[in-house]
A protein has these predicted regions:
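Conserved non-catalytic scaffold segment of RNase H-like nuclease domains
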Residues: 1-103, 109, 139-146
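General secondary-structure edge motif
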Residues: 3, 121-122, 157
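Conserved protein kinase catalytic core
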Residues: 13-15, 120, 179
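Proline- and acidic/polar-enriched loop/turn elements at helix boundaries
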Residues: 61, 112, 154-155
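Acidic, Mg2+-coordinating catalytic module of metal-dependent nucleases/exonucleases
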Residues: 80-90, 95, 99-100, 128-205
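Short alpha-helix plus adjacent loop in nuclease-associated cores
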Residues: 113-133
Length: 205
């Protein structure tokens, strides 16, 4: 089954609007296709702008006036019949579902995989209160596997033909998910292949 790694940058915490959607399709033959879209939005909460560095003016300029509905059919087709992979996927799913509903485009996730929940008991980062382990951040999972973040940066630039440069940019996070998933797959299967050889720091783990 083909996989689609994705991340969103949103206008707030509650399902309102998606300002950026980046995703990478990894086909059955390991072909890699990256897509990144910015969308014009009505409003960006101060908290969201502080985290991402992107406000309404940025989205208007970067999108060229394009809105989510303009690309909804293409996006829905790209997600169709694929394993969708994200970090804290329920958050992104809520935004995707509401944007597709607004656009009037039938949409659903066939199968999903949440890297945050999967790696929670692998990273074993102590939680607070009654929680044995905390939900790990994406960077914490990457660090636990000794993955080189500089190499992810360069890889994301190659895939999207752009400079991403931030953990709060959907392009970088999406490339991180792709690398993380494939590195762990090789580790789990006892394989030292392309992903471990390319992205894991030598002698670090």
């Amino acid at each position: 089954m083909s996989k689609i790694f994705f991340d969103t940058e949103t206008t707030g915490l509650k399902p309102s609007q998606i300002g950026q959607l980046a995703y990478i399709i990894q086909g059955d033959n390991n072909e890699i296709i990256g897509k990144n879209y910015y969308f014009e939005v009505e409003h960006v909460e101060d908290g969201a702008a502080a985290v991402t560095g992107m406000n309404t003016d940025f989205y208007k300029k970067a999108s060229g006036g394009q809105r989510f509905a303009d690309k909804a059919n293409e996006i829905a087709n790209d997600f169709n019949n694929k394993l969708a992979i994200a970090h804290n996927i329920e958050f992104d799913k809520n935004f995707m579902n509401i944007e597709m509903f607004r656009a009037g485009v039938p949409f659903g996730f066939d199968k999903t995989f949440d890297t945050m929940l999967f790696f929670k008991d692998i990273c074993k980062i102590p939680g607070r209160g009654n929680y044995k382990f905390k939900n790990p951040k994406l960077i914490e999972v990457i660090q636990s596997l000794c993955i080189d973040t500089d190499k992810i940066e360069k890889y994301s630039e190659k895939i999207f033909n752009l400079h991403s440069g931030s953990f709060h940019n959907a392009m970088y996070d999406t490339a991180s998910l792709l690398v993380l998933f494939n590195v762990y797959g090789e580790i789990y299967n006892g394989i030292y292949g392309y992903w471990r050889d390319t992205f894991v720091r030598k002698g670090a783990c």
